A protein has these predicted regions:
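N-terminal Rossmann-like NAD(P)+-binding subdomain of aldehyde/semialdehyde dehydrogenases
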Residues: 2-113
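Conserved small-residue-rich beta-alpha loop and adjacent elements
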Residues: 97-157
Length: 157
C-alpha cells in the first residue's frame, strides 16, 4: 500500500496577502462611497438625530464594550474603559450639539463669503490597542456629525 501523503495547504505569499487586503479595502471604500451619497442628502436635523441615537446606543453598551476591550487586548481596567466610553458618548455628543455641519455654517456679509459644510469623503479611522472602543465611539460620532463614512483599521495587538 502506497503511503498517501497529505497535502498541506499552501500559505499565501506576501503579494497574495497584499492583493487580498487591497481588494477588501476597495470593497469597503465602494460601500463608503454609497453611504456618502446617502449622507449628502441629509439635513442638519436628520444628522443630529442620527448622532444622538448612535451616542445612546453606544452608551447603552458602554460596559459590555469595556469588558470586550479588556478581554481582547489584555490591557487596562474595565472600569477605566467604561468611563472612557461614557465620556466618548456623552461629552463628545454634548460638545457637537448645536454645531452646524450641513449647508451654510457661517456668513460674512462684510467680505461677501459664505462658509459651506460638505463631507470630505470616506475617511480612515485608526484605533489604538489601548483604547479601541472609546476611540471608535468618538470617531464614529464625529464622522456621523460631518456626514463622512468611516472605515476603521483596528490595531492588531
Amino acid at each position: 500500500m502506497a503511503d498517501a501523503k497529505k497535502e498541506e495547504p499552501t500559505k499565501p505569499t506576501p503579494e497574495e496577502k497584499l492583493a487580498a487586503a487591497e481588494a477588501e479595502v476597495d470593497a469597503l471604500v465602494k460601500k463608503g462611497l454609497k453611504a456618502l451619497d446617502d449622507f449628502e442628502k441629509l439635513d442638519q436635523k436628520q444628522v443630529d438625530r442620527i448622532v444622538a441615537k448612535a451616542s445612546v446606543a453606544a452608551l447603552n453598551k458602554h460596559l459590555v464594550l469595556a469588558k470586550m476591550a479588556v478581554e481582547e487586548t489584555h490591557r487596562g481596567l474595565v472600569e477605566d474603559k467604561a468611563t472612557k466610553n461614557i465620556f466618548a458618548c456623552e461629552h463628545v455628543t454634548n460638545y457637537l450639539a448645536g454645531q452646524k455641519t450641513v449647508g451654510i455654517i457661517r456668513e460674512d456679509d462684510v467680505m461677501g463669503i459664505d462658509e459651506i459644510a460638505e463631507p470630505v469623503g470616506v475617511v480612515a479611522g485608526v484605533t489604538p490597542v489601548t483604547n479601541p472602543t472609546s476611540t471608535a465611539i468618538f470617531k464614529s460620532l464625529i464622522a456621523l456629525k460631518t456626514r463622512c463614512p468611516i472605515i476603521f483599521g483596528f490595531h492588531p495587538g
